[in-house]
């Protein structure tokens, strides 16, 4: 079975550290942002207080107006993934291509799934039919001919197409210092990295670079005041200046680093700065495409002019696609595409109407109480299974271009994983279109973590490998570092996230090999302890564990031995206890303990996870409000995708902190404040109990603040109270 991944794809042992299931499919429910559910067999045990059936009817009526018709997620199993084979040497690669020099007909899944016919008017009830319809949205019938339009373009007289040593595009890709590059690549191969901490205009920064003797450490470029400080194509500068006449302080500070082709991890993305960051990465991507394209056209003209010369012009990769955007939803893709259009102002837009039909959804789906970050992610078309190619010519941008004919690829992790194909049928797998990617932009990485992060890892593992087929490649034009299998050392990776996590740090460490180094912008956090909006006692309890692989067991043991006894002791007065559990695997463990262990028989409980359907979640919320469920187990992903306004909460126990500090404020502050307003809780009587270990340092810093986190991790005492 291939990587279908509908819903939160399954988990292998621990979901690579997320402790949960994986990738959502079809947005927050049905296709194209629909409101339907699909899920596998579920554990259906909850213990309720024995009451008359009439009580259940009353509680249902009481919650009827409160419970939103929110849908949940569907889930699928995750597949075992094999490590790709080592790339073949250059000579073996050439021998493999000698049998056929002509572009072969496209035989991969992308041909039937890269782009789409218009959606059918009538919805299909059958899931398979529904999947086919959604995949059709991105179908492409175009033949593979990656360089055809470039060969037909006339060369334009443009002195800026000449090599400029001060232009990062040329110094990084076209004419890099061969000696320095070779030394740094060898250092990277030996995993010989070093780092330095510095300050930028907007935050602290950690610069990581390959350690080479007689080489100065890379420095963060100085801020710029306008677009004049960037090496842009003149025609792009003219159009982009209308949209970016002035730069805000963040853009001024971070733009030079992005345009220097260093890897970048920026972990303070939010709803206020997201548009400015999107403008920068789109401008950088289009500038890279234009420079690559114009250089190829100019060299085509030179070669045609001197047919019998020994002129060697290496300006290409194995395949045409150079930019990859990895995005969470079709709506986020729409925003990227619209920004690109605004910056480059093409004369013609081929297939634009079809693009709007497939990626636009104007219906307002959410009530006014949903927060800004939720709206940014889920309003519009929240389908998370898509992929689309964009091709640029001198006056036109074409949507739904065949992948091998495209300059920019935009895809969700699930959509791109399905385009690659299944590990079970390796002959049909195709990831050659990723072989020459020179820039990857991972936007809203925090949202991708709530999907199936293993799809993201899989994509990176199959990027910049030497291709299995020629795809019409002219090897006399391929840059030497491609032939040496060094393309991954030249690729730039840009990750934008609301916060940092171990997964992002690990991806930067294990899959980003840029010889120009890496820059991680590191925010200082004031914490959200004082932003709850009410007075509540907040107690943080640290438990010890020797290694990270023992941490789940240590956390559960601490919960059973130190947290539960007090609840059991006052079982009669434990009504309104919300236990927040970020990891789905931890949730299953705690749920099973509540369901089967006689020690907690006095505690009636309900559950809301990411797999709960609408009636199940509504019933659990109703029983919790009326007291039939004294305890409610609630997962982070359920909150991420639904943002339920739970009522009746009188105390909060956090089995672990959420990655998103906004969730802490909403759960610890918002829920308790609502109970005070409903007179379910006396003012100031709400309590919050948090479990944490030294491995939760990133989460803890965002909640308690940068100044407090060190003491809480290192001090001898293990309990910290805040009021």
Curated annotation (Swiss-Prot):
Acidic residues: compositionally biased ranges: 52-83, 138-167
Major subcellular location class: nucleus
InterPro entries attached to this UniProt entry? P-loop_NTPase, UTP25, UTP25_C, UTP25_NTPase-like
Provide GO CC annotations from the record.
Answer: nucleolus; small-subunit processome
Basic and acidic residues composition bias: which ranges? 41-51
Q: Which GO terms describe its molecular function?
A: rRNA binding; U3 snoRNA binding
A Pfam cross-reference name: UTP25_NTPase-like
Q: Where is this region: Disordered?
A: 1-177
Subcellular localization: Nucleus, Nucleolus
Q: Which UniProt keywords apply?
A: Nucleus, Ribonucleoprotein, Ribosome biogenesis, rRNA processing
Matches recorded under SUPFAM superfamilies: P-loop containing nucleoside triphosphate hydrolases
Q: Which domain of life is it from?
A: Eukaryota
GO BP term (any one): maturation of SSU-rRNA from tricistronic rRNA transcript (SSU-rRNA, 5.8S rRNA, LSU-rRNA)
Disulfide bridges in this chain: none
Q: Does the keyword Nucleus apply?
A: yes
Q: What does this protein do?
A: DEAD-box RNA helicase-like protein required for pre-18S rRNA processing, specifically at sites A0, A1, and A2.
What is the protein name for this chain? U3 small nucleolar RNA-associated protein 25
Q: Which organism is it from?
A: Colletotrichum graminicola (strain M1.001 / M2 / FGSC 10212)
What is the organism lineage in this UniProt record?
A: Eukaryota, Fungi, Dikarya, Ascomycota, Pezizomycotina
């Amino acid at each position: 079975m291939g990587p279908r991944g509908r819903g939160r794809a399954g988990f292998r042992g621990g979901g690579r550290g997320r402790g949960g299931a994986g990738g959502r499919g079809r947005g927050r429910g049905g296709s194209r942002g629909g409101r339907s559910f699909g899920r596998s067999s579920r554990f259906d045990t909850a213990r309720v207080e024995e009451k008359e059936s009439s009580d259940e009817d009353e509680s249902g009526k009481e919650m009827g107006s409160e419970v939103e018709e929110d849908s949940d997620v569907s889930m699928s199993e995750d597949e075992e993934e094999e490590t790709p084979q080592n790339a073949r040497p250059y000579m073996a690669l050439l021998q493999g291509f000698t049998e056929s020099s002509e572009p072969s007909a496209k035989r991969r899944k992308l041909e039937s799934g890269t782009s789409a016919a218009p959606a059918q008017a009538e919805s299909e009830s059958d899931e398979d039919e529904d999947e086919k319809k959604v995949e059709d949205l991105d179908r492409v019938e175009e033949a593979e001919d990656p360089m055809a339009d470039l060969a037909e373009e006339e060369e334009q007289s443009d002195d800026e197409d000449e090599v400029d040593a001060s232009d990062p595009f040329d110094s990084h890709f076209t004419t890099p210092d061969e000696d320095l590059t070779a030394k740094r690549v060898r250092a990277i191969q030996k995993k010989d990295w070093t780092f330095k901490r510095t300050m930028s205009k907007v935050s602290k920064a950690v610069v990581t670079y390959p350690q080479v003797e007689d080489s100065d450490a890379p420095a963060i470029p100085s801020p710029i005041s306008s677009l004049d400080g960037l090496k842009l194509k003149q025609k792009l500068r003219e159009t982009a200046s209308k949209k970016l006449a002035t730069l805000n302080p963040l853009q001024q500070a971070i733009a030079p680093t992005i345009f220097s082709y260093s890897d970048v991890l920026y972990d303070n993305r939010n709803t206020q700065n997201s548009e400015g960051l999107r403008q920068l990465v789109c401008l950088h991507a289009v500038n890279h495409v234009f420079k690559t394209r114009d250089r190829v056209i100019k060299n085509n003209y030179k070669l045609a002019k001197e047919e019998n010369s020994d002129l060697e012009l290496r300006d290409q990769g194995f395949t045409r696609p150079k930019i990859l955007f990895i995005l969470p939803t079709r709506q986020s893709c729409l925003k990227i595409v619209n920004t690109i259009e605004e910056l480059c102002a093409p004369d013609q837009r081929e297939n634009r109407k079809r693009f709007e039909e497939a990626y636009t959804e104007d219906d307002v789906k959410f009530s006014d109480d949903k927060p800004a970050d939720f709206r940014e992610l889920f309003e519009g078309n929240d389908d998370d299974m898509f992929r689309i190619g964009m091709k640029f010519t001198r006056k036109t941008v074409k949507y739904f271009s065949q992948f091998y004919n495209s300059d920019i690829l935009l895809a969700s992790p699930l959509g791109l994983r399905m385009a690659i194909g299944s590990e079970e049928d390796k002959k049909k797998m195709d990831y050659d279109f990723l072989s020459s990617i020179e820039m990857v932009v991972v936007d809203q990485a925090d949202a991708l973590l709530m999907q199936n992060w293993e799809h993201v890892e899989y994509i990176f593992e199959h990027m910049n490998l030497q291709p299995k087929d020629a795809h019409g490649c002219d090897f006399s034009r391929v840059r030497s570092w491609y032939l040496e299998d060094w393309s991954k050392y030249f690729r730039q990776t840009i990750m934008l996230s609301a916060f940092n996590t171990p997964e992002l740090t690990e991806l930067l460490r294990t899959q980003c090999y840029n010889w120009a180094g890496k820059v991680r912008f590191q925010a200082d956090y004031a914490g959200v302890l004082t932003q709850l909006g009410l007075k509540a006692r907040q107690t943080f309890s640290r438990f010890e564990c020797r290694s990270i692989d023992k941490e789940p067991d240590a956390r559960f043991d601490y919960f059973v031995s130190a947290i539960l006894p007090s609840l059991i002791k006052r079982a009669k007065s434990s009504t309104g206890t919300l236990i927040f559990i970020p990891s789905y695997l931890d949730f299953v463990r705690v749920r099973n303990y509540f369901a089967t262990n006689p020690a907690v028989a006095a505690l009636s409980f309900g559950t809301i996870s990411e797999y709960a359907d609408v009636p199940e979640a509504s019933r659990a919320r109703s029983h919790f409000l009326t007291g039939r469920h004294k305890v409610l187990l609630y997962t982070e992903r359920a909150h991420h995708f639904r943002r339920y306004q739970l009522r009746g909460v009188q105390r909060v126990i956090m089995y672990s902190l959420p990655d998103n500090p906004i969730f802490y404020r909403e759960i610890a502050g918002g829920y308790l404040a609502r109970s005070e307003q409903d007179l379910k809780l006396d003012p100031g009587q709400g309590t919050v109990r948090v479990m944490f270990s030294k491995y939760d340092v990133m989460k803890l810093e965002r909640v308690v603040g940068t100044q407090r986190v060190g003491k809480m991790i290192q001090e001898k005492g293990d309990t910290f109270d805040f009021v």
